[in-house]
Amino acid sequence: MPAKPPALKTPEIPVAEYARRRSQVLKGLKNRIGLVHAGSSDAALHGAFRPHPHFEYLTGITDEPGAIIVLDPTAPAGRECTLLLRPLDPEIEKWDGLREEIGTPLRERYGIRMVFRLGRLGIVLNDCLQRTRRVACLHPFGRLDQDVSPDLETFRSLADRYTDIVIEDCTGIIANLRAVKSKSEQAMIRHACDISKIAYLEMLRTVRPGMTEWDVMETLEHGYRSNGSRGPGYNTIVGAGLNGTVLHYTANKAPLQKNDLIVIDSGADFGGYTADVTRTIPASGRFTERQREIYELVLRALKASTKAVKAGCTFAQIDKASRDIITKAGYGDRFFHGIGHHLGLEVHDITPKGPLKAGAVITIEPGIYLPDENFGVRIEDDVVVTRDGCVNLTSGIPKSVAAIEKAMAAR
């Protein structure tokens, strides 16, 4: 059995960085009040809570459902940020564990001086509105696949009490900040990619016909958790044969047949940041001639798009680099999705308008899908955009035909 890889050095985002982010938002707000909600949770029943990514980005707090941070650039120095937490509830704490009293240790850990319980929200907002009647909407009211933002209820309540308030669209403030990753954020995503690499290498050593798609998924996700991840950053896709032509296939229960190609789209989460990796591998350990032909075409497209990445370019230009190659080969209609997306606290991270900036982290994922031949191919890497190119965070995960077959031969 191969030796266990050495433990990875664990990065983190310092408290001071969260404070800098809040300062940047305060600067963008000018004389407007901003609210960011953590979101609600049924964690008492399901044991899982993930805050709204805007809230996590500004605070680093991941275990306080219902929390709100109020940002007021018009407040006296040291009081511009107010964090409001749910009241203590002994009955809930019997089930979920004790929560900390508000005091100096908690304030220092969060790096926020003004921390109160949610019952004080009305007092805090009333104080803010004595200085300004301008209120910022920092994130959209809702999306088709999500509940309506709690902002809407807050805005309605404020408008009922203060008929002269002005609510302004400031959704670009946090979006533009999140689109450019700091060195600490890049380190977090790199770590998620490194954990993914360990898991993918182990998976490649174990895959064989007769296993199921579920077995492949379990091998990957066990590899994530045993190397410091809390699990996958999104639902793992393992599509064998015809299933590999379904972009968001998640049943993951079919058996692996000898001649199947398997499209595997999965990435580890670390500290809220996720990797997003896709590899396509042969169940038998060796590509057929036809599988190799299509695979090499997609790989060539991936390399062309990767070469096109640099600060100032657009996703359209990156997409064109792949699409030209695939279309020229006669498979343009079999590449029916975009080339990639931003990556960060969300797997499809927030995407502001305009060209890419240095520090953005994006995916590149061309594909060709041939349901009439019972297979598809997609290959995906994660890269950091630099001034004159990019840094590939997932280059260590086998990608060439030779590298994949070599890794699978070690089983």
Which positions does each model-derived feature cover?
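Active-site neighborhoods and metal-handling regions in enzymes and metal-associated proteins
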Residues: M1-R411
